[in-house]
A protein has these predicted regions:
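Conserved Class I S-adenosyl-L-methionine-dependent methyltransferase catalytic core
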Residues: 17-131
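Alpha-helical subdomain
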Residues: 1-26, 31-32, 127, 134-305
Length: 305
């Protein structure tokens, strides 16, 4: 299309269209030949690739304004950018009340990466035929729903903030197997809160990266205290040092900045050595690690020492 045609179709002035096209031309998202603008391969992917859209929406709707407070967050150890979205100690207390587009983009980002690993994760977890599973930080119940549909006997309890459990009930009430999904409302930042006992498997997906090392050790220690010798703990995370591609490691370390400025001010995407140390300090030992699940997840399978 010509500049004039693009201006007409977008209802932008000729000046506005030209400014955007020239910027797009120099970053490689469009090409121009004989005064006709053509979408480049990079531009096509920006418009059509789900991962690109999820990442851009997350940064635009959740992070953009808050990142102006990054230095403040680094100095204070608090998510100083979160005030751009609402007044909560961490973003997790506010998930159910985030502004509409921010909430949609946050969950879109969170679900996109975990969903791509769930099918492989189900095979790993259910190879030991658990009949009871504790889903820690289960959010809206996507993993729990996968579990009860994968195995017709398993009972799943989601352990999360009470407001998250309300969202979970709304999301799962019409799903097959919802009657085998239960809730256990707690604030896991309270070190006095114990884990419920009697579960064959404990599951933590994209959960421990939401906490500082000290908090991770506290959570894992309480999990260990609730486990039997036969029980197993499964930690699914995207460890930046265990990625197949250097670009993936780069992206993950940049996501740590979101945790600093927006989420809680003190957590990050972890190096697997740091997580291993936390696991060992919690009275657990690693039985096996499964890498390259989905788009870059690993599952760390743990048992009591």
């Amino acid at each position: 299309l010509s500049l004039e045609q693009i201006s007409q179709k977008t209802e932008l002035s000729r000046y506005a269209a030209q400014v955007l096209l020239e910027a797009s031309l120099t970053i490689g998202t469009v090409l121009v030949k004989d005064d006709q603008y053509i979408l480049a391969k990079a531009g096509w992917f920006l418009l059509n690739d789900e991962m690109a859209q999820v990442n851009m929406n997350f940064n635009q709707d959740v992070n953009y304004k808050g990142l102006f407070h990054l230095e403040e967050a680094l100095l204070n150890g608090r998510p100083e950018g979160l005030k751009e979205l609402g007044n909560w100690p961490t973003i997790y207390e506010g998930l159910s009340d985030l502004p509409g587009q921010a909430q949609k983009s946050w969950f879109g980002f969170d679900h996109f990466y975990s969903d791509n690993s769930f099918d492989q994760a189900l095979e790993i977890v259910f190879s030991h035929s658990p009949r009871t599973l504790l889903d820690v930080g289960g959010n809206t119940g996507r993993w729990a729903t996968k579990c009860v549909q994968y195995n017709e006997k398993v009972e799943v309890t989601i352990m999360d903030l009470p407001q998250q459990l309300e969202m979970m009930k709304q999301k799962t009430e019409k799903m097959v197997g919802h009657e085998r999904i239960h809730g256990h409302g707690v604030n896991l930042l309270d070190e006095k809160v114990p884990f419920p006992k009697g579960f064959d498997a404990i599951w933590m997906s994209q959960f421990l990266d939401c906490f500082s090392e000290k908090e991770v050790i506290s959570i894992l220690s309480r999990a260990a205290q609730s486990m039997s010798a036969e029980g197993r703990l499964y930690i699914m995370e995207t460890f930046w040092d265990r990625q197949k591609f250097e670009t993936a490691a780069y992206c993950l370390t940049q996501i740590s900045i979101y945790f600093t400025a927006m989420a809680n001010g003190n957590s990050k995407m972890y190096h697997s050595d740091d997580m291993t140390r936390c696991i060992q300090e919690s009275g657990l030992e690693i039985e096996e690690i499964y890498d390259n699940l989905g788009l870059g997840h690993s599952i760390v399978k743990c048992k009591l020492k």
